UniProtKB/Swiss-Prot annotation:
Catalytic reactions on record: dTTP + H2O = dTMP + diphosphate + H(+); UTP + H2O = UMP + diphosphate + H(+)
Subcellular location: Cytoplasm
Annotated protein name in UniProt: dTTP/UTP pyrophosphatase
Alphabetical list of CDD domains matching this protein: Maf
Organism whose genome encodes this protein: Bdellovibrio bacteriovorus (strain ATCC 15356 / DSM 50701 / NCIMB 9529 / HD100)
Disulphide bonds in the chain: none
Catalytic residue list: D75 (proton acceptor)
EC top class named in words: hydrolase
EC identifiers of the protein: 3.6.1.9
GO BP terms in the entry: nucleotide metabolic process
GO MF term (any one): UTP diphosphatase activity
Site (Important for substrate specificity): R13, T76, Q160
Length: 192
């Protein structure tokens, strides 16, 4: 019998993507510090946060479940000039981030970490998508900020929402930018 899949995330987008891909899973939200370890390179910083989520979820789940399970955790960051931008702290920060991205390339990196409860086996990997924003006007930026959409998203935009209109082109998986590269998840799950 295959172990149950547990999404350890508060992200409604990750839950939706897994559902739409046909996965059967439970959701257990976990909170961990998402402050990156600056001693690591950017890719490893993002992997480290996904692993911290798995480490926080495992003991919680083991105490409440008798069956074997695989915990799925992810972290997504928008990277500009080699540095993570994070989620905006406030409206002014959202403006700063969107102005920075306007007319330029950036990357979206998602780290996916899966851990099997009975063996402790972990598989993890990152996925990268390159994004090019068209030139944005101040009016467009403030109108978008007024929608509230950018406030809970890395890089201050959602490709699947109104923020998608700012993207001129992208190279890499679309769902990676939404927050969960489904093909990578399928590939990693096949290793169990």
């Amino acid at each position: 019998m295959k172990p149950a899949l547990i999404l350890a995330s508060e992200s409604p987008r990750r839950k939706q993507l897994l559902s739409e891909a046909g996965f059967s899973f439970d959701v257990v939200p976990v909170k961990v510090s998402e402050i990156p370890n600056k001693n690591l390179n950017v890719n490893d910083q993002i992997l480290d946060i996904a692993r911290r989520k798995a480490s926080a979820a495992l003991p919680l789940l083991k105490s409440s479940r008798q069956d074997a399970f695989i915990v799925l955790c992810a972290d997504t960051e928008v990277i500009f000039n080699g540095a993570p931008l994070g989620k905006p702290a406030d409206r002014q920060d959202a403006y700063r981030i969107l102005k920075l991205l306007s007319g330029k390339y950036h990357e979206v990196i998602t780290a996916v970490c899966l851990v099997e409860s009975s063996t402790g086996k972990e598989v993890s990997q990152t996925e990268t998508t390159k994004i090019y924003f068209r030139q944005l006007t101040d009016d467009e930026i403030w109108t978008y900020i007024d929608t509230g959409e950018p406030m809970d998203k890395a890089g201050a935009y959602g490709i699947q929402g109104q923020g998608g209109k700012f993207i001129e082109r992208f190279d890499g998986p679309f769902y990676n930018v939404v927050g969960l590269p489904i093909d990578l998840v399928k590939n990693l799950l096949s290793k169990f």
